Each structure stands twice: as structure tokens, then as C-alpha cells.
Amino acid sequence: MRAAILTLSDKGARGEREDLSGPALSDWLIQQGVVVECMSLIPDDFEQIVSTLEKWIDSLAPDLILTTGGTGVSPRDITPEATGKVIDRELPGFAERMRQESLKKTPHAIISRAIAGIRHRTLIINLPGSPKGAIENLEAVWPAIPHAIAKIQGDPSDCSPL
């Protein structure tokens, strides 16, 4: 599996805050045997998010793109809207599962607006901006990711044997 990680943070992009989530996600993915092909940190800018996601999908064609940051309700949190413009099909079960698991840890999880979806043959998942939240959310949906990617890429086998 090949992945890319996009961190969204105005403060990080200005050099005012170190990106801890992107590297934490990269380390976690590598431990799972995933090849992390690309990592980037950009500001919470709608057009820049859209163009980065589209460029990566068109040029790198990763199996998985994880975004981290910009999923809350602050005025500059626009990652779900930008992702929504990029995806062809939404996969609401990923966000539902992440919120379900996160609510066991914090009542603030209810304000997450993270989404997941497909563009071409790439799965895109929005994760929270904190390293802890990003990893916990990824762990919540990880069991479904390899199967989802196989199906997205055309695996004809049945989903569950009879």
C-alpha cells in the first residue's frame, strides 16, 4: 500500500507550530508496512487543499491519502469542504466509525466534521489535527482500509464468503 499525508495548519505553514501529526501518522503507517510516498504541510486554504489533493492523485496515484487538521468548527477549518470538492463518492462509514470511537474518549468528538471518500482509485480520509486524535481515529478505521482499497481498485472477489 502506498500513502500520502497532508497536514493542514495555518500556524504550521507559517512556521509558528511544529507539525507533529504528519510525522506521527507516517511512523504509524510505516509500522503497518505502508510506503509513505509524500508528506506536505500547507495552510488552511480551500484552493490549495483541492489542488494538492488533485495533483497527488493525478501524478502519484497513491492508494491512500490521509489529511490531518482542519476538521473542526473554527472559521478556517475547511478540510471537509475541500475534500468534498475532490471526491467522486463519499464513504460515510469511516467518519461515523471515527466519531463513534472518539466519543468514548472525549465529548468534543461530536463537533468533528471529518469525511472520507474516493477519487479515482484513491481513498481519502480526514483525520483530526492532534497527533493523538489522528492516530486514534486511524486505528479505529484501519481494519477496513486494506479491504476498501482493494475494492476501490477493482478487486472482483466477494466481500464475505457464503
Task: Show which residues each predicted segment covers.
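Non-catalytic beta/alpha edge segments that cap or flank active sites
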Residues: 1-162
